[in-house]
Amino acid sequence: MFASISPYYGVSFFEFFIVFFSRLFSGKLFYDHLYIDDIQVIVFFAIAVSCSIIGTFLVLKKMAMYANVVSHTILFGLVCACLFTHQLTHLSMQNLTIAAISTTLLTGASIHFIRNVFKVAEEASTALVFSLLFSASLLLLVFLTRNAHVGTELVIGNADALAKTDIFPVFLVLLXNLGVSYCFFSSFICVSFDTVFAFSLGIRVKLIDYLMMFLLSASIVGAFKAVGVLMSLAFLLVPGLIAKLIASSVQEMMGYSMIFGVLSALIAPALSRSILSVHGIGLSTSGLAVCLLLVFYIGTLATVFVRRHILLQSKN
């Protein structure tokens, strides 16, 4: 019955955008009249913008590996929260946020502890903490939540299960990212490029690092239901990596990062719906979004390479 009343039922790729924007500009896109396709676009849009903001600074600070570790180890905190609260399928945003922030701080503290006490390289301590916490989370998922669906949803997400109640949390995370980044924008830039120089200017480097970790964990929590803990890494890093190839300033980099993230967020639901309508095949919307980001990155990388090759040939 839901399909028969949905305006997106049976539409093609371009018809999807016609229906969506006609509903948007005609005022029919009210909270009480949202369909699953509308919710996917809105939630994916908020996730893309939110992750692009903090992702830009993570790429500039060369914290891609740390973000990768956190996106995996945070699964440990989420599973522990499920077990302690005895809620294997539904967790409140408050519990998720506390679990994510706690695991992020635990990851960072463990890396620094192993590096300083055992005098090993940071890469080695990072790999050790990553392997330990992620393997522990997988063991908990296999042995303690075998009869629940929490494992699949935490890892790869379930965009088709999004509801209206999921809109508020992701926009709350977006507002937090926008607010903190606006207030500490210059400090974020200084710390991202040179921590010694930032410290000489009187910037509290550790405070900025903790703020970045807070925004990182909040962004992952905001994205985990739609795209999963692991796939959220793509939204955090890939748009920033694409923007870094073509931008000449931090502002441009953040702008390009948002553009590519939003494009992926808009195209993925439309592509998923059109494939289902035309071919009758249901594909993961979050998986399509990540694949689109990969295509954008490869295309941008190839374009930059060709342009540089042409410039070198013209000079010779």
Swiss-Prot record:
It holds the Pfam family ABC-3. It is a multi-pass membrane protein. It comes from the Bacteria. The chain crosses the membrane at residues 1-21, 39-59, 64-84, 94-114, 124-144, 171-191, 196-216, 226-246, 252-272, 286-306. One of its GO terms (biological process) is transmembrane transport. One of its GO terms (cellular component) is ATP-binding cassette (ABC) transporter complex. CDD domains: TM_ABC_iron-siderophores_like. Keywords: Cell inner membrane, Cell membrane, Membrane, Transmembrane, Transmembrane helix, Transport. Its main location: membrane. It is found in: Cell inner membrane. Part of an ATP-driven transport system TC_0338/TC_0339/TC_0341/TC_0342 for a metal. Belongs to the ABC-3 integral membrane protein family. This is Probable metal transport system membrane protein TC_0342. It comes from Chlamydia muridarum (strain MoPn / Nigg). The lineage of its organism: Bacteria, Pseudomonadati, Chlamydiota, Chlamydiia, Chlamydiales.
